[in-house]
Amino acid sequence: KAAEHGISIILDGVFNHCGADSKYFNKFSNYSEPGAVQQVGSAYDKWFTFHEDGTYESWWGVDALPTIVSDNPDYQEFICGENGVIRTWLRRGARGWRLDVADEISDSFIQKIRAAALAERSDAVIIGEVWEDASNKRAYGKLRQYLEGSELDGPMNYTLRKSILSFLMNEAGAESTALALEELWENYPHEAFYSCLNVFGTHDKERLINVVAGAPTPDSLSAHEQVTYRLSADQ
């Protein structure tokens, strides 16, 4: 239906970690099939890293988000195989994928994701969550290959967001802003430059109106308004 209205659906692929309550980890035994927590030798136990004290690797130490061993061959087949996650959802009508925390999945895995997507539909698009200049990004000591033709069509353009907002907030002048934008133009391949996901507000950043106009102080809001703006720790 979306395609009939000229709308393309880009799905958010989180392939570096999952929820502790997912069927794969099943920390709370909410699923009948044994997850990695319930049974050594389960279909998913090699997808995660457990320590002798019962703890496990998790995304930035958040135990609700166990880290997936994303270079595990079985996991990569689950994601990139003919009937894997990537191809199944493209087959159902999605147009592409946005890769969450691209810095934390390997170049080789991203290459497999892209290959799987293009095998399903030749016009599939792969966007990566990269917060800096994606042409020369170093992550965990390694120079990434995002824009060399076999991984991302383009990144989320947080670099553009930073430059524009710095100018609007009078934190940067016109000349330095122009130079920052020109640097992107020079660094990015032509195709990648025009395939960026340009954003000013996302679930990871402040709302644009709050940045430009200023967020209200908590004391200026009624209890009801506070709830609609930001929940307190107790709430």
Identify what each model region corresponds to:
Residues 212-219:
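Conserved, charged catalytic cores of large soluble enzymes
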Residues 38-39, 76, 111, 145, ...:
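Residue-identity detector for glutamine
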